[in-house]
Amino acid sequence: MRVVILGSGVVGVASAWYLSQAGHEVTVIDRQPGPAEETSAANAGQISPGYAAPWAAPGVPLKAIKWMFQRHAPLAIGLDGTSFQLKWMWQMLRNCDTRHYMENKGRMVRLAEYSRDCLKALRDTTGIQYEGRQGGTLQLFRTAKQYENATRDIAVLEDAGVPYQLLEAKRLAEVEPALAEVSHKLTGGLRLPNDETGDCQLFTTRLAAMAEQAGVTFRFNTAVDALLQEGDRIAGVKCGDEIIKGDAYVMAFGSYSTAMLKGLVDIPVYPLKGYSLTIPIAQEDGAPVSTILDETYKIAITRFDQRIRVGGMAEIVGFNKALLQPRRETLEMVVRDLFPRGGHVEQATFWTGLRPMTPDGTPVVGRTAYKNLWLNTGHGTLGWTMACGSGQLISDLISGRTPAIPYDDLAVARYSPGFTPARPQHLHGAHN
C-alpha cells in the first residue's frame, strides 16, 4: 500500500519507519529542509511514561489565576483573537476534575508505557544511538503539600504497574548526587526508575536516515496546500502544482494539523508554546545524571552527553514563536537553583516550539470518518515519549493488524457525544 505521511517530526518519522517495516511504500512530506526542524528540535529530552499526565488537572483553574501574578509561572495565557482558542480552553477546564484527570492520565500512561517498550525494541533491533540514558526520572517537590499530593499520581502508577520510589529529601542525592548541595530547598521526590532520556532531534534524524535506506521517500522543502477529498476518501495532497497520491494518508503535522484538516475533520488540537535552553556542561559532578522534573515550575532538566537541556513553560498564545527574555530567565533561575555548578548557562542556546495539545491531554491517534485518512497528532509535551508507540499503533491499524494495546479511546471519535470504547480499556501497556 502507498502511504503518504504529512510531517517529519518524531511522530511522523516514527510512523514512516513502522509502516515501511510493515511492507508499505511510504512518502513523507514536510515544508522544512529536514526532519525534526520544528517541535521535535529541542524539547526537554524526557521519555517519561509514568509522568504522562494532562495539564487539565484538579486545582489547575485556581492555580492559573495565581500564576497570572507570578514572575516565574509555568502557565501563561494570551488571547489570540480566535473563537477556537476560547472553545479549547473551555474544553480543557471541563477536564479539570478528578474523574477526567484519572481517565485521561490512565490512557496517556497506557500509550506512553507501550511506546517505551517499542523504543526499546527498536533500539535492540537497530542499535540506534541518540545520547540516550536509562537512568529514570526524578520529580522534585519543594513543598510538603506537593509531597502529600503525590499519592494521587501513585494510585495511577500502581494501577498501571509502573515501578516508583517516593523519596524523602535526604535520599534524593542517592539518585542525583549533585542535589546534595540543595536538599534543604526540597521536601522530597518521586522517582520512576524505568524512565529514559535522549536527544529527540538526533533520534529523529537518524531514524529518518534508516527509514530512507529502507525505502521511505522524503519530500522536504515541500509545502502542503490542501488535502483533496472525493466522497468518503482522500484523493491526494496538493503541493503547489503537484498532486501527491497514495492509498492511505497520515496527518502528523502537529499543531498545524487542525488548520490542514479544516472542513474535513474537526480536531481540538491547539499549539502550546514551550521553551528550552541547551547548556554546555561545566562541572560533571555538579550536573544531573539523568532527568529532573521541578514540580513547582513544571520545568525539566535533562542530561545529554556533554549538554544539559532545560525545558518547560506553557503559553496558550496561538502561533506566536517570539523568544521572550522573561521565559529564559525562568529556565536559567531553575537550573541555577538546583544545579549551580552544572552548566555554562551564559553559553546556552534559547529555543521555542509549539506542542500540539488536546484539551484532555491524550493524543489523537487512529482512523477518521474518511476511509483512508488517519491521524497521529496532538501529543502535546509527550511527542518524544509517545512517538514509537503511536507509530507502531498507526502502522498496525493501517495494515489491518490488531494493536497490542486498547486504542479506541485514542481516536478522534472520543470527542463525539455518547462515545463509549468498543472494547474494555486498561491502563496496562504491552509489557504487562
Curated annotation (Swiss-Prot):
Q: What class of enzyme is it?
A: oxidoreductase
A cellular component annotation (GO) from this entry: plasma membrane
Pathway(s) the chain acts in: Amino-acid degradation; D-alanine degradation; NH(3) and pyruvate from D-alanine: step 1/1
- Under Enzyme Commission nomenclature, its number is 1.4.99.-
Which cofactors, by name? FAD
Among the Pfam families in the record, one is DAO
Q: Name one GO molecular function term.
A: D-amino-acid dehydrogenase activity
Biological-process GO terms, alphabetical: D-alanine catabolic process
Keywords from the named record:
FAD, Flavoprotein, Oxidoreductase
> Where on the tree of life does the source sit, at the highest rank?
Bacteria
Q: Quick one: which residues bind FAD?
A: 3-17
Q: What is catalyzed by this enzyme?
A: a D-alpha-amino acid + A + H2O = a 2-oxocarboxylate + AH2 + NH4(+)
> What biological function has been recorded for the protein in this entry?
Oxidative deamination of D-amino acids.
Database matches in PANTHER family: D-AMINO ACID DEHYDROGENASE, SARCOSINE DEHYDROGENASE-RELATED
Record-stated family: Belongs to the DadA oxidoreductase family.
The identity of this protein, by name, is D-amino acid dehydrogenase
